């Protein structure tokens, strides 16, 4: 083991395993290993750079961030949530309760619930689509129109004016009229 101290206050120690430990005046440390691995001890975190290019940041609050060579970034939070940012810009959040939220590069949001039901919000038209475990689907448009397709194929549509149209699987159409407008005051 050999230690050199420089006028700048830096201290470099060559350890028996061939690694180099640099202590800086600000209290941070840099540890370089013979295999190319580098570990940096900072005030708020420990940063590790693996020989294969993977970077791992361990924060004092328990957050761990791993950045892969392909640009994928994975963040493990102390509460158990995992947030992954993919090279294409998509972001996935896995929550402790089992829900998964995915924001696609185009802004579309897809939330998969623990019970396997799925809610999708399409950014291009603001439409929300709810796919339930039983197979039924509810779609809600920005203008207030709602359409539900039941597992037997029955389609129920409610329009913004309050009118409801139901089309049964046998082709029967049931339609209600829109409620009358409120009289002027």
Give residue spans per PLM region.
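Repetitive, compositionally biased segments used for assembly/scaffolding
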Residues: 1-185
């Amino acid at each position: 083991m050999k230690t050199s101290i420089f006028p700048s206050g830096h201290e470099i120690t060559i350890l028996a395993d061939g690694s180099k430990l640099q202590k800086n005046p600000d209290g941070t440390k840099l540890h370089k290993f013979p295999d190319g691995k580098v570990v940096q001890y900072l005030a708020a975190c420990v940063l590790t750079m693996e020989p294969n290019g993977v970077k791992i940041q361990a924060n004092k609050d328990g957050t761990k961030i791993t950045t892969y060579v392909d640009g994928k970034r994975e963040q493990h939070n102390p509460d158990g949530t995992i947030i992954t940012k993919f090279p294409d810009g998509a972001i996935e959040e896995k929550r402790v309760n089992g829900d998964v939220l995915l924001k696609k590069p185009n802004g579309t949001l897809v939330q998969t619930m623990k019970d396997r039901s799925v809610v999708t919000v399409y950014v291009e038209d603001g439409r929300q689509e709810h796919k339930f475990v039983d197979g039924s689907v509810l779609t809600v448009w920005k203008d207030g129109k709602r359409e539900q397709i039941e597992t037997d194929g029955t389609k129920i549509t409610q329009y913004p004016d309050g009118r409801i149209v139901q089309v049964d699987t046998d082709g029967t159409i049931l339609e209600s009229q829109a409620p009358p407008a409120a009289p002027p005051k």
